[in-house]
Amino acid sequence: MILEKPSWIRHEGLQIFSIDIQTGGLRFATGGGDQKVRIWSMESVHKDNTNNDSKQRLLATLRDHFGSVNCVRWAKHGRYLASGSDDQVILIHERKAGSGTSEFGSGEPPDAENWKVIMTWRGHTADVVDLSWSPDDSTLASGSLDNTIHIWNMNNGICTAVLRGHTSLVKGVTWDPIGSFIASQSDDKTVMIWRTSDWSLAHKTEGHWTKSLGSTFFRRLAWSPCCHFITTTHGFQKPRHSAPVLERGEWAATFDFLGHNAPIVVVKFNNSTFRKNFSSDQDPKAAPVGWANGASKTPTKEQQPYNVIAIGSQDRTITVWTTASARPLFVARHFFSQSVVDLSWSPDGYSLFACSLDGSAANFHFEVKELGHRLSDSEMDEWKRNRYGDVGGRQSNLAESPAQLLLEQASAKQSAGEKVTSIVEQGKAPPKVSAGVPNPGLVVLSLEVPEVSHEDSKKTAGPTADDVKKGNQLSSPVKQREYRRPDGRKRIIPEAVGFASNQDNIPNHSQNHPVNFSSLDQRMNGTKPSYGSNSNSNNCGVKDRTSVTARANITESLVIQKASAGAGNDGRLSIEHTRSMAPSSLTPCSALSIHVINKNGNEDALPVCLEARPVERGAGDMIGVGALSTKETEIKCIKGTKTLWSDRISGKVTVLAGNANFWAVGCEDGFLQVYTRCGVRAMPAMMMGSAAVFIDCDDSWKLLLVTGRGLMYIWNLYDRACILHDSLASLVASPDESSAKDAGTVKVISATFSRCGSPLVALASRHAFLYDMSLKCWLRIADDCFPASNFASSFSFPQGGELGKLQIDIGKFMARKPIWSRVTDDGLQTRAHLENQLASSLALKSAQEYRQCLLSYVRFLAREADESRLREVCESFLGPPMGKVGSASPTDPKNLAWDPDVLGMKKHKLLKEDILPSMASNRKVQRLLNEFMDLLLEYETDVTLIPQPGTEGNGNGNDKVMTS
C-alpha cells in the first residue's frame, strides 16, 4: 500500500467539501470553501513532487459559483462535470477547445484546459449538498437543504420532477446502478427509496437512525455495484457509531459497519467487484467449472465475489471494508485534523481519494493482493443480467405513440425563458408616458398635437403598447441578498432582477415621475408642497418623451391611514401628502417639458407646451380692502415661440394632464379646471373637496383623478359623465390584520390608466391593484406573497409588458426583505404564483404575457405530473363537444358560454401549438396528452364536415362543406 497526502491539493487554505475522480482516470476534481471548482491531473499524484511542474498539476480553476462548492461529480462518460453550491445553483461544465483563462488580478498563469459552463440549473431554494448521475448520464439527481430532491434532464436542461417527502434537510442522494431507484437520506433520520419510472415513493425506512447523535455536514450514502445493498450513514449502535446496510427488496437493515467513534459522514463503494486471490495451484483459469472432473457446480466460498467499501467519519478516520470479512481491511488514523467529508475510488478500483474539512486531500493506493482480483466489466454485466434481467430499457419511460416523440421534439425547442412574440396584431397607437415635476413652482406640459377636427378627435383611439428603449435592454447590475446562518457565518447570494430600468421602483408608464427609494424613506410627513422647493435636480431641462398624452404631478405619494374605531370618526380616512425635499444648495430647474412625436408623420409640427407658472402678488398690487397677499398661477399654452392662449387661476397647481382633445389642471385648493384644446373653459371649476394628487388621461376623452382624501374619479369629458367614483379605502388593511408599525396605513405612489383602460394603482409596498369595472372591486395583480416561488425573481416576460415591469419591481423590493424559511414549500408557492400571474395578465388584457404565463404554468404542471389541473386547462381550451357550442343547458358549467378566443388568440391554436407540446416534456402524462390530441383531431374533423350557412337543403346533393 502507498499512502500519499499531496500538499499542493488545496483551496486557498479553506475547506475541501468534495472530491471525485473522472471515469477515464486522467483527472480528478475538488470543490471547496473558496467558491471554486479545481480540476487536477491524476498523473501528477504518483510523480515525484519535487520534479513535477506545478503547471501540470492544476489543469483548470472554475470560478462560476457564488457560494461554497459542496459537491462535484463526474458523469460516467467523463465529458461533463456537475457542481452544486451554497448559491442554490447546479452547473454543468464541459471541456472546450483551446486553453483557459486566468482570474484578473490573481497573478496566476492561464488554465491549461478550457472548461466552460454549458448548463445552469436553478430551482432549489437552499444549499445544494449532493449530486448523483444516472447510469446512462441522461439525468442528474440533486439533494438540497430545502428538503427536496430535484431530477434534471440533460437533454433539455429541464427539471422533470421534484421529490418531496423528507421533513428535514436532504444531505445525501445516490442512484441505483441499474437505474430503477434513487435513495436519499435526510436529517429527519429516514432513508427514502424512490422509483424512477414514475418518481413515486417506493419505501420509507426509519428507526435505524433514531439514536444517532450530533449533526454532520453531509449524509452521503452509497449503492453497491452489485445493486443489492445500500450503505447509509450516521447510524448508532451503542456504544459505537455505525453505517447501517439496507438490502434491496425489503429495504430493511441487515447488518451494520461498526467501529467509528463519531458520526459517519460519507460511505463510498468501490466501482468494481472483487474476487479473492488464488495461489499458483488455484489459478482461476485452470479451475474446473461445472461437473467436469467431479468439480462442484457452484463456486466455492473463496471464489464468491465481494464488494469493497470505504467509510469516512467525523473522528477523522477512514476505514476500508470488504463484504467478505467482519473486520475492516484497513484503518487510516491521524491523516486529517478535521472530519472526512468525501471519498472517491479510481476507475481501476485500487486507489482511494479522500478530502477533509481541514483543507487537505489524501490518496491511498492498494495492491492486488490486498483487495483481490477485480471482475471485468463483461463479468459484472453478465452477473447483473442473470440477476435483474436486461436493464437497458429501465432508464426512462417508453413513448406510447409516435405523436409523443414529435411533441417532445417541439417541447425541446420551447425554452422556459424564450422570447414569445405576439400572436395578435398589436395596435399602432403610441403609448403614454409620465414625467416628474422638479420644480413645484413651474409645471410644464408639452404636447405635439396634430391638426385634427373636432369630429375626428371624438373618436376613440385603439389600444396602446409601450415602446421599450434600447437603454432599458441593458442587463441590470447584480443585486444580492445577505443574511447570517445560525452558526454565525454570513451568506451573500447574488440575484438577477431582469432588465435595467431608468427608475428604481415603478416603470415610467405607470408613475408620475421618478421616485428614489432612499427619498421615500426620508420623507417629511405633513409637509405641503411649496413653490421654490426642488424634488429632483437631476430632471433639469427638457425631457424628450414619446407620447400622445401626458401628465405632471407635484405630489410624489399619498399616505392614507384608516383611523381606529375608538377615535370617534367612524373609520374615516386620514390623508397625508408626502414629498421629498431636496437640499437647498441645489439649483431649482426652470422647466420640464414632455415632447410628443406627431404620429401622423408631420415632421414640421412644433411641440405644444402647457405651462403653469406661479404669480406672487403683494398687498400693494391688489385692488380693494385687505393687506394679505394672494397666490395665482398663470396657465400658458405655447407652440414654438407663439403663445396660443393663456389664463390665470387662483391657488397652486398640483397636477396637469392633457391630450389632443383637452387640458386638465388640478389645484391645491381642491378644484379641477378643464380646458378645450383652444383654451376655452369647457365647464365651471369642478370642486373635489381636497387637493388633486394624481391625474392621468387616455388618448380620447377619459380623465382619471385621485384626491387627497383617497377618492378616485374617472370621467368621460365628451359625454360629461362620471364613469367611476370610488375610494382607495379598500386598499388599506385593517389594524388587526397588519403589523403594528403600518397598521391601517397605505402609501400610494402611482395612479394611472392601464393599457386596458382600467385604473392601475401602485403602492409603496410595490403591490399593484387594478380596478375591474365589471366586478366593481380592486384586483391585486402584483404582490410579494410568493417569495419561495421559482419564478419570484427570474420570470422572463415579453419586453414592454405591464405585468413584467411590475414583477421586476416586486423582485427588487423583495431583495430588501428577510429571506423566507428554507422549509417553505416552494412547489406550492410556485404553482400559486404562476396561477396568479396568469389571472393578472388576463385582467390586464396582455396577450403576450398571458401566453408566456400559460406556457410556464403548463410546463410546471407537467413536471409535477398534476393531471387534474392539466385536464382542467386542456378542457377550457378545447371547449364543449362539437354541436353543443351555444346550445348548452344553463346547468352545465363546462359548456356555458364558451368563447373560442382569449385576448384575440384562438384557443385551439394555443392548445395545439403551445399547451400540448409543453405537456410532452414529461412522459408520465403522455396518456392524458394523447387523449386530448385525439379529441382535438376529432373536433377539427367535425368542423370540416359542417355545411356552410345557406348551403343546406339545395336538393341537388352537391352541398358545399366548410374547410378548415
Curated annotation (Swiss-Prot):
Compartments, record wording: Nucleus
Keywords annotated in UniProt: Chromatin regulator, Coiled coil, Nucleus, Repeat, Repressor, Transcription, Transcription regulation, WD repeat
Tissues in which the protein is found: More abundant in apices and young leaf primordia than in fully expanded leaf tissues.
CDD domains xrefs: WD40
Leader sequence segment: none
Chain positions of WD repeats: 10-50, 64-103, 123-162, 165-204, 259-331, 335-376, 644-685
SUPFAM superfamilies recorded: WD40 repeat-like
GO terms (BP aspect): chromatin remodeling; DNA-templated transcription; regulation of DNA-templated transcription
Coiled-coil ranges from the UniProt annotation: 920-940
Region (Disordered): 453-490
GO terms for cellular component: chromatin; HIR complex; nucleus
Basic and acidic residues: compositionally biased ranges: 479-490
UniProt cross-references to InterPro entries, sorted A to Z: CAF1B_HIR1_beta-prop (IPR055410), HIR1-like (IPR031120), HIRA-like_C (IPR011494), WD40/YVTN_repeat-like_dom_sf (IPR015943), WD40_repeat_CS (IPR019775), WD40_repeat_dom_sf (IPR036322), WD40_rpt (IPR001680)
Summary of the function given for this chain in its UniProt record: Histone chaperone involved in maintining knox genes silencing throughout leaf development.
PANTHER family: MEMBER OF THE HIR1 FAMILY OF WD-REPEAT PROTEINS, PROTEIN HIRA
Assembly, per entry: Interacts with RS2.
Recorded family membership: Belongs to the WD repeat HIR1 family.
Protein name as catalogued: Protein HIRA
Gene source species: Zea mays (Maize)
